[in-house]
Amino acid sequence: MSFDLLKDINKKVHFIGIGGVSMSGLAAVLLNAGYKVSGSDSKESEITNRLKEEGAKIYIGHSKDNLQDVDVVVYTAAIPSDNPEIIKAKEDNLILMDRAEFLGQIMKGHKFNVAVAGTHGKTTTTSMISHVALSADLDPTILVGGDLDIIHGNFRVGNSEYFITEACEYKQSFLRFFPYVGIILNIDADHLDFYKDINHIKDTFKQFVRLIPNDGYIIGNADDEKVMEVLEVAKCNVLTYGINNGDIQARNIEFNEKGCATFDVFRNEEKLLSLSLNVPGMHNVSNSLSAVCLAEIFNINADAIVSGLSSFGGAHKRFEYKGTKNDITVIDDYAHHPVEIKATLSTAKKMNHNKIVCVFQPHTYTRTKTLFNDFVKCFDDCDELVLMDIYAAREKDLGEINSDQLGDAIRSHGVKCTNVHSHEEALEYVNANLSKGDLLLTVGAGDVVKVGELFLN
């Protein structure tokens, strides 16, 4: 059995895990197109309430009874095969589609699909691009992996041919997409619970590039050797950017006291515009250049680019300011890969704080084990590290790796590091060791943010 989104408007679609960031956006697009939508989630949330208001039938908890008069069931990689709704869908011979395949179906209904790929920076860059597209009145449909203030959440349903989405490489999910413009920000070893090695990852990105039609475009980071290697297979138009290389470059870069950059953008030797960003870090200078490349492709004028990028203050959980208490600043960041952590700490170091205390929660046993040596070396820019237990996410603890082992190695490397085993223990350390003018930085993709929230409250 198959499902064609453009023809099967009478089909009723059910989402398992509808409250998730990615699934909720897909559900909203369908509701706007006139589909009957239902979905289940483990708990009620702002997202499920918003979807209910828009006409979705929401079930809290998973049960075979939730599949009432349903034709298509959509699920994510996080849903186990013994989920009662998956079992019921198979028993009833319903159409079962994973999230990536279903998103690909939605993309078929748009001409100008923009897919933002890369190991790091997808959410921030997708958000930047969304700001520029909205500033240019393109009326895009947007699916982003974090909450974005300008669209009041993680999705926006537009009424144009423009569709902007993140493209995650995990389990090769982005190979189900239909991009007209692909963007590759960077390529590093990650998701090694699925990929064999970096060559396997590069081969998958090459397949992504081959998806783009001959009249389409691939935008790539010319400062990243692995990206440039991948772009060699392109049969479509190629546009590159970088701080030091590429068709589009940033020059005359200066940072203010908040770590945010002002710079000039050149295409070859022609100055296109000057930009002042409202998000910190050199990595965001690079990310913003990919948005300029896209603007060049879609003939967006300089005023809209400047307006869009200068108005972007960051996506939630991406170097997000959480508050200040006793003149101690609290910032939360989603970084969970050594490259991301180094970029986050480098950004923090450009700000004028007396001391940087980083509370880090490793994310998944596989990532911690496979990138162990990189994790040991990525905290050099913090003054003190508070290391929490590994956040398991979708994995089981096989007893092969733990945070105490990582902490020992980090201490041997010369970084002041303290292991803690609960949010409360982390809070005790923070309360005892931070003083006026310091920065508390919570880092990770799990629930480490609670430490900063406990401190502020």
Swiss-Prot record:
Record key words, sorted: ATP-binding, Cell cycle, Cell division, Cell shape, Cell wall biogenesis/degradation, Cytoplasm, Ligase, Nucleotide-binding, Peptidoglycan synthesis
Identification of the protein by name: UDP-N-acetylmuramate--L-alanine ligase
Record's catalysed reaction(s): UDP-N-acetyl-alpha-D-muramate + L-alanine + ATP = UDP-N-acetyl-alpha-D-muramoyl-L-alanine + ADP + phosphate + H(+)
Presence of keyword Flavoprotein: no
Gene3D superfamilies: Mur ligase, C-terminal domain, Mur-like, catalytic domain, NAD(P)-binding Rossmann-like Domain
GO biological process, one term: peptidoglycan biosynthetic process
UniProt GO cellular component terms: cytoplasm
Phylogenetic lineage: Bacteria, Bacillati, Bacillota, Clostridia, Eubacteriales
InterPro entries recorded: Mur-like_cat_sf, Mur_ligase_C, Mur_ligase_C_dom_sf, Mur_ligase_cen, Mur_ligase_N, MurCDEF_pg_biosynth, UDP-N-AcMur_Ala_ligase_MurC
SUPFAM superfamilies on file: MurCD N-terminal domain, MurD-like peptide ligases, catalytic domain, MurD-like peptide ligases, peptide-binding domain
One Pfam family, short name: Mur_ligase_C
A molecular-function term among this protein's GO annotations: ATP binding
EC numbers, comma separated: 6.3.2.8
Pathway note: Cell wall biogenesis; peptidoglycan biosynthesis
HAMAP family in the cross-refs: MurC
Location within or outside the cell: Cytoplasm
Binding site for ATP: 118-124
Function statement: Cell wall formation.
Cleaved signal peptide residues: none
